[in-house]
Amino acid sequence: MTASSRNVRFNVSDDYEILDVIGEGAYGIVCSAIHKPSGQKVAIKKISPFDHSMFCLRTLREMKLLRYFNHENIISILDIQQPQDFESFSEVYLIQELMETDMHRVIRTQDLSDDHCQYFIYQILRALKAMHSADILHRDLKPSNLLLNANCDLKVCDFGLARSAVSTEDSSSFMTEYVATRWYRAPEIMLTFKEYTKAIDIWSVGCILAEMLSGRPLFPGKDYHHQLMLILDVLGTPTMEDYYGIKSRRAREYIRSLPFKKRVSFASIFPRANPLALDLLEKLLAFNPAKRVTAEEALQHNYLEPYHDPDDEPTAPPISPSFFDFDRIKDSLTKNDLKILIYKEIMSMNN
């Protein structure tokens, strides 16, 4: 069936009735729909990736990883529309759970209570514990990638930039596609620490918590230099130990050229916040990635005590770096090679 909503054509099976366009991105559009046999409301994400290799790679990562994880706080793929044949295959249709809104919209339209902040951060960290136990870095955690429903259930989405945490690829390759929103980027990414760890996701969670507490982004940098300045305006000039933790000589010289800055207390920035929230925030936003808490440690923090249950915070089996073999050889893959990989991935799900 070809359905249209706002002049958008969705070539999906007759099992689905398309309702409304609910989101648009660089290479995709999302509609709400009803799965007629079950009556279930779903979201259908239409992706047209074949114009750019980068979009193909993102689509492949997203499909493979969302199929791998089976977690309450990670969006799942219910189905993928099977193409008629390889030759005419030009669009990917992912059928997913329907979530009503996202954290970006919620923060923009209402003040969040402390209870909301607790519950949302708990769910983000619960998802992150599973991802990190599987040796996956999300690399693009931000409010718009946190989907919410009316019950305040939270699900992390958009794994298009995800990577193996044990990858052998060098940092320059790791960064090639790094277009993650600057405001949630850890300082080591800008200072080229040479190796990137699970701590980059933890930093993003800290930025999200800060934004939930105040309703505004904590570090809304206009460019690379401004971003770093805003971080140092709050955290202060790095200690000698943290300074020498920066492997890049050029980055160290740049930091040394900046005027000395004193640390600003989070209590003065967020005067109405729960002190326990601010204590967790300090641990999430440590300048030195080696000193940041892990997702598992953060879940045990007193701020999250109302929700923490060690028996209900599942891990996931580690993913072999070979899962991302296509990423390692991506420079030698043609768009047709990538199309074949995506086609095979879809057919394997439908089998």
UniProtKB/Swiss-Prot annotation:
Catalyzed reaction equations: L-seryl-[protein] + ATP = O-phospho-L-seryl-[protein] + ADP + H(+); L-threonyl-[protein] + ATP = O-phospho-L-threonyl-[protein] + ADP + H(+)
Biological processes, Gene Ontology terms: mitotic cell cycle G1 arrest in response to pheromone; response to pheromone; signal transduction
Protein's organism: Pneumocystis carinii
Keyword Ion transport: no
Temperature-dependence annotation: Optimum temperature is 30-35 degrees Celsius.
Binding site for ATP: 22-30, 45
Cellular location(s): Nucleus
Keywords (A to Z) from UniProt: ATP-binding, Kinase, Nucleotide-binding, Nucleus, Phosphoprotein, Serine/threonine-protein kinase, Transferase
Entry's family note: Belongs to the protein kinase superfamily. CMGC Ser/Thr protein kinase family. MAP kinase subfamily.
Ranges of residues in domain Protein kinase: 16-304
Enzyme nomenclature, EC number: 2.7.11.24
Stated regulation of activity: Activated by tyrosine and threonine phosphorylation. Inhibited by the MEK inhibitor U0126 but not by the p38 inhibitor SB203580. Cobalt abolishes kinase activity, while calcium, copper and nickel have little effect on kinase activity.
One annotated Gene Ontology cellular component of this protein: nucleus
Main location class: nucleus
Protein name: Mitogen-activated protein kinase 2
Pfam families on file: Pkinase
Phosphotyrosine: residues carrying this PTM: 178
Field pH dependence: Optimum pH is 6.5.
Domains (record comment): The TXY motif contains the threonine and tyrosine residues whose phosphorylation activates the MAP kinases.
Motif TXY: chain residues: 176-178
Cofactor mode of binding and number, as noted: Divalent cations including magnesium and manganese.
